[in-house]
Amino acid sequence: MRPRDQGFLVLGFTYSVLLISLATFYWLRNNDSFLHYWCVLLLCPATLWLWALIAWCDSEMFASSKDE
């Protein structure tokens, strides 16, 4: 697999993690329990950190890839 294709694969995975997290937070918004607050407090920073880390690694892969 070419590095550029690997970069697109990692980028797609990154955005899918972000979209699944946002959809989960949206679903929990209408929940009456206090689970919503714990999920936002604990998972939102971890999700954003993971998204930034994978996006940075992906940008490094794109920067070092060569068109063949």
From Swiss-Prot:
Cellular component terms per the entry's GO annotation: endoplasmic reticulum; endoplasmic reticulum membrane; glycosylphosphatidylinositol-N-acetylglucosaminyltransferase (GPI-GnT) complex
Disruption phenotype: Defects cause hyperactive Ras phenotypes, probably due to diminished GPI-anchor protein production.
Residues in the signal sequence: none
Transmembrane segments: 8-28, 34-54
Places the protein is found: Endoplasmic reticulum membrane
Keywords from the UniProt entry: Endoplasmic reticulum, GPI-anchor biosynthesis, Membrane, Transmembrane, Transmembrane helix
This protein's pathway: Glycolipid biosynthesis; glycosylphosphatidylinositol-anchor biosynthesis
Biological process annotations from GO: fungal-type cell wall organization; GPI anchor biosynthetic process; Ras protein signal transduction
Membrane topology note: Multi-pass membrane protein
A single GO molecular function term of this UniProt record: GTPase inhibitor activity
Function comment: Probable component of the GPI-GlcNAc transferase (GPI-GnT) complex in the endoplasmic reticulum, a complex that catalyzes transfer of GlcNAc from UDP-GlcNAc to an acceptor phosphatidylinositol, the first step in the production of GPI-anchors for cell surface proteins. Ras may inhibit the enzyme activity of the GPI-GnT complex via the association between ERI1 and RAS2.
Subunit structure, as described in the record: Component of the phosphatidylinositol N-acetylglucosaminyltransferase (GPI-GlcNAc transferase) complex composed of at least GPI1, GPI2, GPI3, GPI15, GPI19 and ERI1. Interacts with GPI2. Interacts with GTP-bound RAS2 in an effector loop-dependent manner.
Name the record gives this protein: Phosphatidylinositol N-acetylglucosaminyltransferase ERI1 subunit
Protein's organism: Saccharomyces cerevisiae (strain ATCC 204508 / S288c)
Designated gene of the protein: ERI1
